[in-house]
Protein backbone atom coordinates (compact mmCIF):
# COMPACT_ATOMS: atom_id res chain seq x y z
CA UNK A 1 0.00 0.00 0.00
CA UNK A 2 1.34 3.41 -1.01
CA UNK A 3 1.47 5.85 1.91
CA UNK A 4 2.29 9.55 1.65
CA UNK A 5 4.21 11.05 4.56
CA UNK A 6 4.59 14.84 4.29
CA UNK A 7 7.58 16.05 6.36
CA UNK A 8 5.34 18.25 8.51
CA UNK A 9 3.38 15.21 9.73
CA UNK A 10 6.23 12.72 10.18
CA UNK A 11 6.81 13.66 13.81
CA UNK A 12 4.75 11.96 16.50
CA UNK A 13 1.36 13.57 16.89
CA UNK A 14 1.00 15.81 19.93
CA UNK A 15 -2.44 14.99 21.28
CA UNK A 16 -4.14 15.33 24.64
CA UNK A 17 -5.37 11.76 25.09
CA UNK A 18 -7.35 12.11 28.31
CA UNK A 19 -10.59 13.43 26.86
CA UNK A 20 -10.59 11.54 23.56
CA UNK A 21 -12.37 8.30 22.73
CA UNK A 22 -12.02 6.65 19.32
CA UNK A 23 -14.69 4.16 18.23
CA UNK A 24 -15.23 2.07 15.12
CA UNK A 25 -18.92 1.69 14.34
CA UNK A 26 -18.44 -1.28 12.02
CA UNK A 27 -19.64 -4.76 12.92
CA UNK A 28 -17.74 -6.08 9.89
CA UNK A 29 -14.10 -6.69 10.88
CA UNK A 30 -12.87 -6.09 7.31
CA UNK A 31 -14.06 -2.48 7.62
CA UNK A 32 -11.95 -1.77 10.72
CA UNK A 33 -8.52 -1.58 9.07
CA UNK A 34 -8.71 2.18 8.55
CA UNK A 35 -9.79 2.70 12.18
CA UNK A 36 -6.80 0.71 13.42
CA UNK A 37 -4.39 2.74 11.26
CA UNK A 38 -5.81 6.01 12.61
CA UNK A 39 -5.59 4.81 16.22
CA UNK A 40 -1.99 3.71 15.68
CA UNK A 41 -1.02 7.10 14.24
CA UNK A 42 -2.68 8.93 17.13
CA UNK A 43 -1.11 6.62 19.69
CA UNK A 44 -4.44 5.78 21.33
CA UNK A 45 -6.35 2.57 21.94
CA UNK A 46 -9.63 1.89 20.18
CA UNK A 47 -12.63 2.43 22.45
CA UNK A 48 -14.41 -0.65 23.78
CA UNK A 49 -17.71 -1.19 22.00
CA UNK A 50 -19.75 -4.09 20.69
CA UNK A 51 -21.62 -3.69 17.40
CA UNK A 52 -23.49 -6.73 16.16
CA UNK A 53 -26.64 -8.03 14.49
CA UNK A 54 -29.39 -9.70 16.49
CA UNK A 55 -30.89 -12.93 15.08
CA UNK A 56 -33.85 -10.83 13.90
CA UNK A 57 -31.40 -8.60 11.90
CA UNK A 58 -31.72 -5.64 14.26
CA UNK A 59 -28.50 -3.74 15.00
CA UNK A 60 -27.36 -3.55 18.61
CA UNK A 61 -24.62 -1.28 20.00
CA UNK A 62 -23.16 -1.62 23.50
CA UNK A 63 -20.60 0.99 24.57
CA UNK A 64 -18.38 -0.57 27.22
CA UNK A 65 -16.56 2.45 28.65
CA UNK A 66 -17.47 5.91 29.92
CA UNK A 67 -17.79 8.72 27.36
CA UNK A 68 -19.21 11.34 29.73
CA UNK A 69 -17.68 14.74 29.04
CA UNK A 70 -15.34 13.39 26.34
CA UNK A 71 -14.72 14.08 22.65
CA UNK A 72 -15.98 10.97 20.88
CA UNK A 73 -14.77 10.26 17.34
CA UNK A 74 -16.76 7.57 15.53
CA UNK A 75 -15.05 6.16 12.43
CA UNK A 76 -17.41 4.54 9.96
CA UNK A 77 -16.23 3.06 6.68
CA UNK A 78 -18.98 2.01 4.33
CA UNK A 79 -19.40 -1.70 3.64
CA UNK A 80 -21.34 -3.36 0.84
CA UNK A 81 -24.37 -3.46 3.15
CA UNK A 82 -24.65 0.32 3.19
CA UNK A 83 -28.00 0.54 4.99
CA UNK A 84 -26.79 -1.61 7.90
CA UNK A 85 -23.66 0.54 8.08
CA UNK A 86 -25.78 3.68 8.38
CA UNK A 87 -27.89 2.19 11.17
CA UNK A 88 -24.74 1.16 13.07
CA UNK A 89 -23.51 4.74 12.90
CA UNK A 90 -26.82 6.35 13.89
CA UNK A 91 -27.35 4.02 16.86
CA UNK A 92 -23.80 4.55 18.13
CA UNK A 93 -24.09 8.34 17.79
CA UNK A 94 -27.36 8.33 19.71
CA UNK A 95 -25.89 6.04 22.39
CA UNK A 96 -23.01 8.50 22.92
CA UNK A 97 -25.45 11.41 23.02
CA UNK A 98 -27.56 9.81 25.73
CA UNK A 99 -24.34 8.95 27.63
CA UNK A 100 -23.50 12.68 27.89
CA UNK A 101 -20.51 12.83 25.54
CA UNK A 102 -19.09 16.36 25.25
CA UNK A 103 -18.96 16.20 21.44
CA UNK A 104 -19.61 13.48 18.87
CA UNK A 105 -17.58 13.74 15.68
CA UNK A 106 -18.33 11.41 12.79
CA UNK A 107 -15.35 10.38 10.65
CA UNK A 108 -17.01 9.13 7.46
CA UNK A 109 -14.44 9.13 4.64
CA UNK A 110 -17.02 8.19 2.00
CA UNK A 111 -20.41 9.77 2.60
CA UNK A 112 -23.08 7.25 1.51
CA UNK A 113 -25.93 8.19 -0.83
CA UNK A 114 -23.86 11.14 -2.05
CA UNK A 115 -24.84 10.36 -5.64
CA UNK A 116 -28.46 11.03 -4.70
CA UNK A 117 -27.86 14.70 -3.92
CA UNK A 118 -30.07 16.13 -6.68
CA UNK A 119 -33.79 15.98 -7.35
CA UNK A 120 -34.61 13.66 -10.25
CA UNK A 121 -38.20 13.51 -11.45
CA UNK A 122 -40.37 12.28 -8.56
CA UNK A 123 -37.40 11.08 -6.53
CA UNK A 124 -35.92 12.67 -3.43
CA UNK A 125 -32.64 14.19 -2.25
CA UNK A 126 -31.58 11.24 -0.11
CA UNK A 127 -28.26 12.73 1.00
CA UNK A 128 -30.18 15.63 2.57
CA UNK A 129 -32.37 13.12 4.44
CA UNK A 130 -29.29 11.25 5.68
CA UNK A 131 -27.64 14.49 6.82
CA UNK A 132 -30.75 15.39 8.81
CA UNK A 133 -30.84 11.93 10.41
CA UNK A 134 -27.20 12.19 11.50
CA UNK A 135 -27.72 15.62 13.04
CA UNK A 136 -30.90 14.47 14.78
CA UNK A 137 -29.11 11.42 16.21
CA UNK A 138 -26.61 13.72 17.91
CA UNK A 139 -23.65 14.27 15.58
CA UNK A 140 -21.94 17.60 16.38
CA UNK A 141 -19.23 17.61 13.68
CA UNK A 142 -18.44 15.66 10.51
CA UNK A 143 -15.10 14.79 8.91
CA UNK A 144 -15.40 13.41 5.40
CA UNK A 145 -13.38 13.27 2.20
CA UNK A 146 -14.07 14.40 -1.37
CA UNK A 147 -17.84 14.71 -1.26
CA UNK A 148 -19.41 13.84 -4.61
CA UNK A 149 -20.79 17.38 -4.67
CA UNK A 150 -19.33 20.01 -2.35
CA UNK A 151 -22.80 21.50 -1.91
CA UNK A 152 -23.70 18.49 0.28
CA UNK A 153 -21.96 20.37 3.11
CA UNK A 154 -24.93 22.74 3.09
CA UNK A 155 -27.29 19.86 3.97
CA UNK A 156 -25.85 19.81 7.51
CA UNK A 157 -26.50 22.31 10.32
CA UNK A 158 -23.22 21.27 11.98
CA UNK A 159 -19.58 21.95 10.98
CA UNK A 160 -18.34 19.78 8.08
CA UNK A 161 -14.67 19.35 7.15
CA UNK A 162 -14.49 18.02 3.59
CA UNK A 163 -10.86 16.88 3.29
CA UNK A 164 -9.15 16.25 -0.05
CA UNK A 165 -7.32 13.14 -1.25
CA UNK A 166 -5.78 14.84 -4.30
CA UNK A 167 -2.38 15.54 -2.60
CA UNK A 168 -1.97 11.79 -1.99
CA UNK A 169 -2.98 10.87 -5.55
CA UNK A 170 -0.73 13.56 -7.03
CA UNK A 171 2.24 12.28 -5.07
CA UNK A 172 1.47 8.74 -6.21
CA UNK A 173 1.63 9.93 -9.82
CA UNK A 174 4.95 11.68 -9.23
CA UNK A 175 6.58 8.79 -7.37
CA UNK A 176 5.05 5.66 -8.93
CA UNK A 177 4.73 6.62 -12.61
CA UNK A 178 8.34 7.14 -13.77
CA UNK A 179 7.52 8.83 -17.10
CA UNK A 180 4.52 10.83 -15.88
CA UNK A 181 5.92 13.93 -17.63
CA UNK A 182 4.73 12.32 -20.86
CA UNK A 183 1.20 11.97 -19.49
CA UNK A 184 -2.03 13.80 -20.14
CA UNK A 185 -4.82 14.15 -17.56
CA UNK A 186 -8.16 12.96 -18.92
CA UNK A 187 -11.73 13.80 -17.92
CA UNK A 188 -14.01 10.98 -19.03
CA UNK A 189 -16.87 13.46 -19.35
CA UNK A 190 -17.24 17.26 -19.35
CA UNK A 191 -18.68 16.99 -15.81
CA UNK A 192 -15.28 15.91 -14.43
CA UNK A 193 -13.27 18.48 -16.42
CA UNK A 194 -12.69 20.78 -13.43
CA UNK A 195 -11.13 17.98 -11.41
CA UNK A 196 -8.94 17.00 -14.35
CA UNK A 197 -7.90 20.63 -14.84
CA UNK A 198 -6.88 20.86 -11.17
CA UNK A 199 -4.63 17.78 -11.52
CA UNK A 200 -3.18 18.99 -14.82
CA UNK A 201 -2.30 22.45 -13.50
CA UNK A 202 -0.57 21.05 -10.42
CA UNK A 203 1.44 18.51 -12.42
CA UNK A 204 2.11 20.98 -15.28
CA UNK A 205 0.55 18.55 -17.77
CA UNK A 206 -1.91 18.79 -20.63
CA UNK A 207 -5.59 17.93 -20.39
CA UNK A 208 -8.00 15.99 -22.58
CA UNK A 209 -11.78 15.70 -22.30
CA UNK A 210 -13.91 12.87 -23.67
CA UNK A 211 -17.24 14.10 -24.98
CA UNK A 212 -20.07 12.17 -26.57
CA UNK A 213 -22.14 9.02 -26.18
CA UNK A 214 -24.38 10.90 -23.75
CA UNK A 215 -27.23 8.90 -22.29
CA UNK A 216 -30.72 9.55 -23.51
CA UNK A 217 -32.71 11.90 -21.31
CA UNK A 218 -35.43 10.20 -19.29
CA UNK A 219 -38.72 10.48 -21.10
CA UNK A 220 -41.37 12.65 -19.53
CA UNK A 221 -43.94 10.42 -21.22
CA UNK A 222 -42.83 7.53 -19.02
CA UNK A 223 -43.22 9.24 -15.66
CA UNK A 224 -46.48 11.01 -16.51
CA UNK A 225 -45.17 14.57 -16.56
CA UNK A 226 -46.23 14.91 -20.18
CA UNK A 227 -49.81 14.08 -19.24
CA UNK A 228 -52.40 16.37 -20.89
CA UNK A 229 -54.31 18.79 -18.65
CA UNK A 230 -57.60 17.69 -17.11
CA UNK A 231 -60.62 17.99 -19.40
CA UNK A 232 -62.20 20.71 -17.22
CA UNK A 233 -59.15 22.94 -17.57
CA UNK A 234 -58.69 22.55 -21.34
CA UNK A 235 -61.30 25.16 -22.12
CA UNK A 236 -59.54 27.69 -19.89
CA UNK A 237 -56.32 27.50 -21.94
CA UNK A 238 -56.14 30.01 -24.77
CA UNK A 239 -55.40 28.29 -28.11
CA UNK A 240 -52.46 30.62 -28.79
CA UNK A 241 -50.76 29.85 -25.46
CA UNK A 242 -48.63 26.74 -25.80
CA UNK A 243 -45.81 26.01 -23.36
CA UNK A 244 -42.58 25.42 -25.30
CA UNK A 245 -40.97 22.01 -24.82
CA UNK A 246 -37.27 21.44 -24.23
CA UNK A 247 -35.56 19.92 -27.26
CA UNK A 248 -34.65 16.29 -26.45
CA UNK A 249 -30.97 15.34 -26.24
CA UNK A 250 -29.30 13.23 -28.91
CA UNK A 251 -26.11 11.21 -28.63
CA UNK A 252 -23.31 13.15 -30.32
CA UNK A 253 -20.41 11.24 -31.90
CA UNK A 254 -17.71 10.51 -29.33
CA UNK A 255 -14.88 13.04 -29.40
CA UNK A 256 -11.60 13.40 -27.53
CA UNK A 257 -10.75 17.07 -27.08
CA UNK A 258 -6.97 17.08 -26.68
CA UNK A 259 -4.02 15.05 -27.96
CA UNK A 260 -3.36 11.68 -26.30
CA UNK A 261 -1.34 10.05 -29.09
CA UNK A 262 1.88 8.49 -27.78
CA UNK A 263 1.05 9.62 -24.24
CA UNK A 264 0.14 8.09 -20.89
CA UNK A 265 -3.53 8.79 -20.19
CA UNK A 266 -4.48 9.36 -16.54
CA UNK A 267 -8.26 9.42 -16.03
CA UNK A 268 -9.25 11.19 -12.81
CA UNK A 269 -12.59 11.11 -11.00
CA UNK A 270 -13.93 11.06 -7.44
CA UNK A 271 -15.76 7.69 -7.45
CA UNK A 272 -15.23 4.39 -9.26
CA UNK A 273 -18.40 2.34 -8.93
CA UNK A 274 -19.94 1.06 -12.15
CA UNK A 275 -16.86 0.83 -14.37
CA UNK A 276 -18.58 0.72 -17.78
CA UNK A 277 -17.89 4.40 -18.49
CA UNK A 278 -14.22 3.98 -17.52
CA UNK A 279 -13.86 0.94 -19.79
CA UNK A 280 -15.40 2.83 -22.71
CA UNK A 281 -13.10 5.79 -22.05
CA UNK A 282 -10.06 3.49 -21.96
CA UNK A 283 -10.99 1.90 -25.29
CA UNK A 284 -11.42 5.32 -26.86
CA UNK A 285 -8.06 6.52 -25.55
CA UNK A 286 -6.34 3.38 -26.87
CA UNK A 287 -7.86 4.01 -30.29
CA UNK A 288 -6.53 7.58 -30.16
CA UNK A 289 -2.98 6.36 -29.50
CA UNK A 290 -2.52 6.37 -25.70
CA UNK A 291 -0.01 3.64 -24.83
CA UNK A 292 -0.76 3.35 -21.11
CA UNK A 293 -3.93 4.10 -19.16
CA UNK A 294 -4.28 4.82 -15.45
CA UNK A 295 -7.48 5.53 -13.52
CA UNK A 296 -7.21 7.59 -10.31
CA UNK A 297 -10.08 8.14 -7.88
CA UNK A 298 -10.68 8.81 -4.20
CA UNK A 299 -13.45 6.29 -3.52
CA UNK A 300 -13.23 2.76 -4.91
CA UNK A 301 -16.70 1.26 -4.56
CA UNK A 302 -15.90 -1.25 -7.34
CA UNK A 303 -19.37 -2.78 -7.32
CA UNK A 304 -20.56 -5.98 -8.94
CA UNK A 305 -18.14 -7.39 -11.57
CA UNK A 306 -15.88 -4.33 -11.55
CA UNK A 307 -12.64 -6.23 -10.65
CA UNK A 308 -13.11 -8.79 -13.44
CA UNK A 309 -14.02 -6.13 -16.00
CA UNK A 310 -11.00 -4.01 -15.06
CA UNK A 311 -8.68 -7.03 -15.29
CA UNK A 312 -9.93 -7.81 -18.80
CA UNK A 313 -9.89 -4.18 -19.99
CA UNK A 314 -7.35 -1.86 -21.62
CA UNK A 315 -6.79 -0.14 -18.26
CA UNK A 316 -3.27 -0.74 -16.93
CA UNK A 317 -3.78 0.36 -13.32
CA UNK A 318 -6.57 1.62 -11.06
CA UNK A 319 -5.46 3.69 -8.07
CA UNK A 320 -7.91 4.40 -5.23
CA UNK A 321 -7.62 5.38 -1.57
CA UNK A 322 -8.67 3.27 1.41
CA UNK A 323 -11.77 5.33 2.24
CA UNK A 324 -13.69 2.14 1.41
CA UNK A 325 -12.33 -1.38 2.11
CA UNK A 326 -11.60 -3.27 -1.12
CA UNK A 327 -9.12 -6.01 -0.18
CA UNK A 328 -11.28 -8.71 -1.79
CA UNK A 329 -11.42 -6.75 -5.05
CA UNK A 330 -7.61 -6.41 -5.01
CA UNK A 331 -7.27 -10.19 -4.78
CA UNK A 332 -9.54 -10.53 -7.81
CA UNK A 333 -7.71 -7.83 -9.78
CA UNK A 334 -3.98 -7.12 -9.27
CA UNK A 335 -4.38 -3.91 -11.30
CA UNK A 336 -6.06 -2.23 -8.31
CA UNK A 337 -3.63 -0.27 -6.11
CA UNK A 338 -4.33 1.49 -2.80
CA UNK A 339 -3.17 4.81 -1.38
CA UNK A 340 -3.40 5.17 2.41
CA UNK A 341 -5.09 8.39 3.59
CA UNK A 342 -5.20 7.58 7.33
CA UNK A 343 -2.57 10.27 7.97
CA UNK A 344 -4.78 13.23 7.03
CA UNK A 345 -7.76 11.81 8.94
CA UNK A 346 -5.57 11.33 12.02
CA UNK A 347 -4.30 14.90 11.78
CA UNK A 348 -7.86 16.23 11.42
CA UNK A 349 -8.91 14.32 14.56
CA UNK A 350 -5.88 15.62 16.48
CA UNK A 351 -6.52 19.23 15.49
CA UNK A 352 -10.23 19.13 16.33
CA UNK A 353 -9.60 17.50 19.70
CA UNK A 354 -6.83 20.00 20.59
CA UNK A 355 -8.88 22.96 19.36
CA UNK A 356 -6.35 23.84 16.64
CA UNK A 357 -7.02 25.47 13.28
CA UNK A 358 -7.96 23.19 10.38
CA UNK A 359 -6.73 25.62 7.71
CA UNK A 360 -3.38 23.80 7.47
CA UNK A 361 -5.19 20.82 5.89
CA UNK A 362 -6.77 23.05 3.23
CA UNK A 363 -3.68 24.87 1.99
CA UNK A 364 -3.65 25.70 -1.75
CA UNK A 365 -7.15 24.27 -2.20
CA UNK A 366 -9.30 26.30 -4.58
CA UNK A 367 -13.02 26.41 -5.24
CA UNK A 368 -12.71 23.87 -8.07
CA UNK A 369 -10.72 21.30 -6.04
Curated annotation (Swiss-Prot):
Gene3D superfamilies: 3.40.50.2020. GO terms for biological process: bone development; nucleotide biosynthetic process. The modification Phosphoserine is found at residues 219, 227, 233. SMART domains: Pribosyltran_N. Keywords: Acetylation, Nucleotide biosynthesis, Phosphoprotein. Transmembrane segments: none annotated. Seems to play a negative regulatory role in 5-phosphoribose 1-diphosphate synthesis. NCBIfam families: ribP_PPkin. This is Phosphoribosyl pyrophosphate synthase-associated protein 2. It comes from Mus musculus. The lineage of its organism: Eukaryota, Metazoa, Chordata, Craniata, Vertebrata.
Amino acid sequence: MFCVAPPELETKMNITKGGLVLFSANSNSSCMELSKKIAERLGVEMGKVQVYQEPNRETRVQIQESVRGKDVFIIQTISKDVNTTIMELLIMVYACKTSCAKSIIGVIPYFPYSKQCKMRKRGSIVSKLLASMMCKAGLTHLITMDLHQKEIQGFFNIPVDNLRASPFLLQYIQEEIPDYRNAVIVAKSPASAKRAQSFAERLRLGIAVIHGEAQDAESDLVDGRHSPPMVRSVAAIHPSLEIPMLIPKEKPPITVVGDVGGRIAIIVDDIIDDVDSFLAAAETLKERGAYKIFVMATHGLLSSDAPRLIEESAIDEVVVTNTIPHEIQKLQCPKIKTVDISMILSEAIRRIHNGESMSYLFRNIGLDD
